[in-house]
Curated annotation (Swiss-Prot):
One of its GO terms (biological process) is cardiolipin biosynthetic process. The lineage of its organism: Bacteria, Bacillati, Bacillota, Bacilli, Bacillales. The gene is clsA. The active site is at H222, K224, D229, H400, K402, D407. Its EC number is 2.7.8.-. This is Major cardiolipin synthase ClsA. It comes from Bacillus subtilis (strain 168).
Length: 482
């Protein structure tokens, strides 16, 4: 027997073993199991490699044992809220919070997402505005700057932000930068050399320990967080790069949604950053530092919870929050998302809302940045069009916003897309906002986006050509592993 025959036989045996693992050991979602079995069957050698990189379920194993809030900062507030829930003494100060108390309860109990009502929130929908504000806040920093992004590019915007951080580090401000290795794969280590020399610290999330193989490649930190002096925070969809200023000809204008906030909710963002930082850092880990959690009094009256999820989570908290919002809807649901690949539970919740007479509106991009994801999105959109949803295609560039608004009362803004990757594999963060004024601001933004969007009807969907139907079918089949 030739060497090639032996190798083929070996790969065939390994494929069978992997199939057994996929079916019996991993205990994954049935649709994901079938998708991986198809990959292993049709492309046995490449499929084996892809499974090692993207398919092996490392969820909630020793890989993710870094969750420890007790020495970080919000444990005391969380303890009081859990006690108030048990004794039914929890208080709400406005209609939006009272009407959604079951959602607030769920996120406190299952995500330890502390609820605060002393926040001010600014909604930002333009990249130039976002980074102008961020650079202004950085220039005023006195104690520390904590910055975390999935994508950080070494282009003009990346350099401008880096140089601002270098200046603050030279002034004695503590600067910490955390970026994801895969998302920021074009960034060279020397890019932050001067920042390190100025006293700043830079860490990489889940770097490859054995290049080019990284068994944690499938689990990426998709969070975008900035905390300045423990008083001002940013969270949302914008990464760092010129394309987010609308300078990439492929995408054109980049429409995203970010929020700038002040208030006790910043402490929750700070806690999340420190937990992620301590996982990535081996020499500069952080414990509780009073300056990271200053007591500066109320900044507003916006109710809010900072909700995180990831492969270290027991529950898919952000997805569960979405489902609860949708299930509680009485009048309307507005969704903006670049990718729409819901699992069965979320799809059913939206379908039931449509069939119950709720006005469900969904806005998606007119162009793909990931082809398979785009075609899978159209497939699921077809299901909801049939159920009565209204769908809009954004035509003024690329819409990357991840927002949900329900009944013009509550909203979610953050990093999580409506897809399986965001719900189960990526580390994500969303702000759940219980405030009519902020909700109406997001509704107004949605209406402004309608002016540069076109309605996508069910009749139009039914008339799509055969080649698009084939693309959709294949992409949907693979959607659980995209």
């Amino acid at each position: 027997m030739s060497i090639s025959s032996i190798l083929l036989s070996l790969f065939f045996i390994l494929n069978i073993l992997l199939a057994i693992i996929v079916i019996f050991k991993e205990r994954r979602d049935a649709s994901a199991s079938w998708a991986w079995l198809l990959v292993l069957f049709f492309i046995p050698v490449l499929g084996f490699i892809l499974y090692l990189l993207f398919g092996h379920n490392l969820r909630r194993k020793h890989l993710f044992q870094w969750e420890d809030r007790k020495k970080i900062g919000i444990e005391r507030l969380l303890k009081h809220q859990l006690e108030d829930l048990e004794t039914k003494q929890f208080q709400f100060n406005n209609r939006a919070t009272f009407d959604n108390k079951d959602l607030i309860y769920m996120l406190i109990m299952n995500n330890h997402a502390v609820f605060t009502e002393d926040n001010s929130v600014d909604v930002i929908t333009d990249g130039r505005d976002k980074f102008q504000r961020l650079l202004s806040d950085i220039s005023k920093a006195k104690d520390h700057i904590h910055l975390q992004y999935y994508i950080y590019k070494g282009d003009e915007l990346g350099k401008k932000l880096r140089d601002a951080l270098i200046q603050k580090a030279k002034e004695g401000v503590q600067v910490r930068v955390l970026y994801d290795e895969l998302g920021s794969r074009t960034l060279r280590k020397k890019f932050f050399k001067e920042l390190r020399e100025a006293g700043g610290h830079v860490e990489v999330f889940f770097p490859s320990k054995l290049r080019p193989i990284n068994l944690r490649l499938n689990y990426r930190n998709h969070r975008k967080l900035v905390i300045i002096d423990g008083m001002t925070g940013y969270v949302g969809g914008f990464n760092v790069g010129d394309e987010y200023l609308g300078l990439n000809p492929k995408f054109g204008y980049w429409r995203d949604t970010h929020i700038r906030l002040q208030g006790t909710a910043v402490h929750a963002i700070q806690t999340r950053f420190i937990l992620d930082w301590n996982q990535a850092s081996h020499h500069h880990t952080l414990t509780y530092i009073p300056n990271h959690f200053p007591d500066y009094g109320p900044k507003g009256n916006v109710g809010m919870q900072i909700v995180t999820s990831g492969p270290d989570s027991e529950w898919e908290q952000i997805k569960n929050g979405y489902i609860k919002m949708i299930s509680n809807a009485k009048r309307s649901i507005l969704i903006q998302t670049p990718y729409f690949i819901p699992d069965a539970s979320l799809l059913d919740a939206l379908r039931i809302a449509c069939l119950s007479g709720i006005d469900v509106n969904i806005m998606i991009p007119n162009k793909p940045d990931h082809a398979f994801v785009y075609w899978a999105t159209l497939s699921y959109i077809g299901d909801l069009l049939k159920a009565g949803a209204t769908v809009y295609i954004y035509d003024n560039g690329f819409i990357h916003a991840k927002t949900i608004v329900v009944d013009d009362e509550i909203a979610s803004v953050g990093t999580a897309n409506i897809d399986v990757r965001s719900f189960r594999l990526n580390f994500e963060v969303n702000a759940f906002i219980y405030d009519i004024t902020i909700a109406k601001k997001l509704v107004s933004t949605f209406k402004e986006d309608l002016l540069v969007s076109r309605k996508f009807t069910y009749e139009e969907y039914l008339q799509r050509p055969l080649w698009i139907r084939i693309k959709e079918s294949v992409s949907r089949l693979l959607s659980p592993i995209l």
